[in-house]
Amino acid sequence: ENGRVRFEGDLRDIMVANLWLRTADRVKIIVGEFDATDFDSLFEQTKALPWEDLLPIDAAFPVEGKSHRSQLHNVPSVQAIVKKAIVDRLSTVYHRRTRLSETGATYPLEVAINKDHVLLTLDTTGPSLFKRGYRKGKGGAPLKENMAAALVMLAHWFPGNPVVDPVFG
């Protein structure tokens, strides 16, 4: 897939990936994947997922969205339907009749729809991994650390060999 690398692992693997991946921007958990061409299908299939395994009762879970070449192209409506489905699921599982407080930790979610295929993910990273930088002061347009690491890997550079950067300024 363009822009993604998938792997299977456990919680330890997620922590290790966030700590040591040099070229990644984010590490996300795939919560669910399915096809949906209408809002009812999106709602029901989202609600059927085991959200209680990932989100505590007080979780704040903002839902970001994107849609490409799909019948469900109104992103704000898609985000609202996904949010409502998760709230319904958690309210049922946690036996809540009142509104969920969402005062706890934040669990950023994303709904991405491409050609009617829905991918629901939970972001485990927080700020982008390129922001973990080692530099205290940065110039006007620094190269992101993950991009620099990718370029070094693509160049087949070995320690001890000189590095020439013709665009260093």
Which residues does each PLM region occupy?
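S-adenosyl-L-methionine
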Residues: 1-26, 65-80, 112-160
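Non-catalytic nucleic-acid substrate-recognition regions in nucleic-acid-modifying enzymes
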Residues: 1-107
